[in-house]
Amino acid sequence: MDAMIGDPMSATSVEAVFEKQPSPEFRELVTPRAMAVAVVLSVVICFVGMRIQMTAGIVPALNMPASILSFFLLKWLIRLLQSCGFPMLPFTRQENMFLLTCIITCLNLALTSGFATNIIGMTSTVARSLADDPDPRDIMDHVPIGKWIVYLFLVGMTGVLINVPFNQVMIIDYKLLFPTGTVIAQLINSFHTPEGAYVAKMQVATIFKVFFGSFSWSMFQWFYTAGDDCGFQHFPTFGLGLYKHRFYFDFSATYIGLGMICPHIVNFGLFFGAIISWGFLYPFLETKRGQWYQTDSPTSLNGQNGYKVFISVTLIITDGMINFLTLITTASINFYQLRKEHDLGLANYFKKHPSLNYDDRKRIEVFLANRIPIPVPVAAYITCAAISTIAIPAMFNQIKFYHLAVLYMVIPVVTFCNTYATGLTDWSVAPTYAKFTTFVFAAWIAKPGAVVASLLASGVIVAALHISSQAMQDLKSGHMTLTSPRAMVTGQIFGVAVGSILCPCVFLAFQSTTKPNAPVGSKQSDYPCPFAGLYRAIGVIGTGGVKELPKHCMTFCVVAFCVTVIIDAVVLVSQKRGWSIHRYIPSMTVIALPFFAGSYFTIDMCVGSLLLLAWTRMNAKSAEMLSSAVAAGLICGEGLFTLPSALLNMFKVQPPMCMKFLSGGEEVEAADSFLNNLGTSRT
């Protein structure tokens, strides 16, 4: 063992448990058996994910079911082949991670493919639902499947390639948590823990106990969700008045678990953002209805939603840009020193960071030894961008090469911003960027065909940003399981290749089952694609430019920009001068997320943070060893229940009850009267 790595004899060391296991070579990770299982599970997971997205619009996280299914299916396949007399390599956690990143990348491409959002928004079905006589140049109904395969492959590869140059910055230098990636790594490590490690066995036992409790709780909650806004997820904990402003505790095991592993400053920063937005700003804006804006629609950009989207995007982009420019400036100033450190390699890195524990040192050693040289993904991204700039306009004449050239120049910056936000909070705001892009490109083009062009541009952005941020989650998992970054990126490329073929085929399968008078995208269809109309409406509004936004929206954006610059400047000065104040200032990206996402989840995460603080106060050693295991169990249990819940929904099995809360007075009397009449009619 390398003496630089440190002492593995630590009670809570994960890598000490795996010390006797040799590191597998690349060919032992990227195996045909893993690829075969990845294809099978990708079909299942993508089918479920796209089905939910096309019916409900919002897809729960399917990473946890994919993690558990991938482990058990590949393990079963290996045992089956061994029983048939075939010699098999050992099933390692590294191969498990390669398999998992293939599936998750394929799933993320399916969810950002646009077959429930922007692509359906181009169709005549959705166009006629918004206008009686839409311009035929802003409609695109029948596109050959080959075009969609090429389009999806290009945008998927964009997401994978743009992510690679930021790997070391996000995971090693910034030490971002990427909560889902951390939890999945904890789960994979627990699955593959060698027998005999006391602490590891205790952590595994804790994960499965909490997992069972979380799964059971999710199943219990399901019975009370028979209608809209029903169940414990809509429990008005602090009263109906605050519930209307989305301040309530929704009993989510996932968010409580996230709160236990996210830093306290992140959790309370989210809550602070929720108070500013939903506690003060949005109630104030509601009083201006009829003066600053007219529409009551919760999704229209020329209503209150316009403030939400543009303020949150301004905060996130400004904060991300400042971090990006700080990184570039620091690297430029210290170029010579950084070059010198790079030449000295691993030994120099460890000398500069003597406080790293054994696990961190071991993981950094593997990461740096297998990293991809930055010129390789940069050259690949430029090549992919050049091909896309030529190929996409050739397939879709509504968008021009210079539109895509600008888009591909902007993508690296917004990718950095979005991935940074995901690393801090586990939230990808790629859909928000997509809405913003739709509006900007529609306003830029502002002629017939602008709606289709803006929807294509938003499709490129949402796929690139979301796939990139989730690929970084996977790389965080790979980092914590000693999986080679090269193998992880290979798995992501394979996932994109599978997904680009699979997604159009799954969509065509759904399309073939619809009734002639209720095509995909119509309100009468089994697949109404509820967000398709929203994306198209943004494009239609965007053709009118900034004047279509509600009054003073741009003023609020300027204020948000200035506040972010001032606060980030204070943080940078504090860090430079060694003041401690920066430790108590949350990231503006964190504060911005509740502006658009809502405030309910911030309360859950604060509860998780408070539980961890109380546990640490009572027994610090126990909290250090088991808190991440408890968090993993909470997240995985609720995450896995999404699969049976989705299957029940697919087979039209509805929950038997609806638990709903009403304010006293006329609402209760009306409900009592209805229930009494219902009982009378049945007798």
UniProtKB/Swiss-Prot annotation:
- One Pfam family assigned to this protein is OPT
Q: Which GO terms describe its cellular component?
A: membrane
Location, primary (coarse class): membrane
Q: Which UniProt keywords apply?
A: Membrane, Transmembrane, Transmembrane helix, Transport
Which InterPro entries does its entry note? OPT, YSL-like
Residue spans crossing the bilayer: 29-49, 58-78, 97-117, 142-162, 204-224, 265-285, 309-329, 372-392, 404-424, 448-468, 490-510, 553-573, 595-615, 628-648
Under the GO molecular function aspect, what terms does this record hold? oligopeptide transmembrane transporter activity
Q: What subcellular compartments does it reside in?
A: Membrane
* Highest rank taxon of the organism: Eukaryota
Mode of membrane association? Multi-pass membrane protein
- Report the function annotation for this chain: May be involved in the transport of nicotianamine-chelated metals.
The entry assigns this protein to a family as follows:
Belongs to the YSL (TC 2.A.67.2) family.
Instruction: From the Swiss-Prot or TrEMBL record, give the protein name.
Output: Probable metal-nicotianamine transporter YSL3
The organism of origin for this protein: Oryza sativa subsp. japonica
